[in-house]
Amino acid sequence: MAKRDYYEVLGVAKNASDDEIKKAYRKLAMKYHPDRNPDSKDAEEHFKEAKEAYEMLSDGQKRAAYDQYGHAGVDPNMGGAGAQGFGGFADAFGDIFGDIFGQAAGGAARGGRGGPQVYRGADLRYSMEITLEQAAHGYDTQIRVPSWVSCEVCHGSGAKPGTKPETCPTCHGQGTVRMSQGFFSIQQTCPKCHGTGTYIPEPCAHCHGSGKVKETKTLEVKIPAGIDDGMRIRSAGNGEPGINGGPPGDLYVEIHIKPHSVFERDGDDLHCQMPIPFTTAALGGEIEVPTLAGRASFPVPEGTQSGKTFRLRGKGIKGLRSSIAGDLYVHVQVETPVKLTDQQRDLLKQFEKSLAEGGARHSPQSKSWFDRVKSFFE
């Protein structure tokens, strides 16, 4: 069965504030909590649905992903935006664009009934600047990122050599404690051991009891051709390590494309401003323009006006999800000559005089504009 819209579940508008979302969730949680409806499967499902909606909409990144892509943007099992067609990159650099916005850092789940909580490692993020050419053609590079590794002194236990972690006396190794609040009996993470089920009487001096130390590691990054500004590449398992056997987090490389001196990108299309002499605009001719693949030329017809746009098909960028390249839009700007010689001025005056004899035949836009101005004042 298709999932309901999260905003609909909580009964709030899409532009609802964080406080409005929280209040709506609390109201539903009180109404459908299993302790208040012990024999109602329907109430249990409503409670789970509200809890899931709140978890997504109360997290800024997840909410942004959901607003843009819907359930596919926050559910890794649904193959969200950009998740298809990139198996070839997975071997070199994880699952490209799989679950683009990732999960909340340090998510917890119980490792087993009665056992300590298992924590997923936190995600890491790395910002990288590349050129438009690198984005268009693809780019292989290396990055150096900080990484947490197991402490070699205590071998990851966090305890001073010769000692070992002991069972937490507060939760008796469960990782959680149960507290009663009014109608509810709430299970929460043990405040002493933070869900590990153990505590360390004598911490390792090298890692200060964390069981891990930070080092810098080098990763190969394969940036696919057609990547756009703001997109992220996910390197699975290269985030921080998990706790109590939990899976490691992921590394997200966020791509930023430097401004280009000639082109502006719009999706798979490119735009450029091309100055042309007024003689070419009047008489027509062939002009040459740069493209990301080299030079290209196209004819300019007689009487071309400044601001005219020419479309060169297939001279843009081949996008990630496209089998064909976008287009290049050339916006011509007719240049007016400056610093004329006396001879050039005389020639232009003769030319201007000859134009007056032709009237609107030579300047149709000017004639149309003056006609509109005249009717405006009448």
Swiss-Prot record:
Location in or out of the cell: Cytoplasm
Keyword Metal-binding appears in the UniProt entry: yes
Sequence ranges assigned to domain J in this UniProt record: 5-70
Amino acids binding Zn(2+) 2: 168, 171, 190, 193
UniProt keywords, alphabetically: Chaperone, Cytoplasm, DNA replication, Metal-binding, Repeat, Stress response, Zinc, Zinc-finger
Signal peptide: none
CXXCXGXG motif repeat coordinates: 151-158, 168-175, 190-197, 204-211
Coarse class of the protein's main subcellular location: cytoplasm
InterPro entries: DnaJ, DnaJ_C, DnaJ_domain, DnaJ_domain_CS, HSP40/DnaJ_pept-bd, HSP_DnaJ_Cys-rich_dom, HSP_DnaJ_Cys-rich_dom_sf, J_dom_sf
Family, per entry: Belongs to the DnaJ family.
HAMAP family tied to this protein: DnaJ
Assembly and interaction partners: Homodimer.
PANTHER family for the chain: CHAPERONE PROTEIN DNAJ (PTHR43096:SF48), DNAJ HOMOLOG 1, MITOCHONDRIAL-RELATED (PTHR43096)
Name under which the protein is recorded: Chaperone protein DnaJ
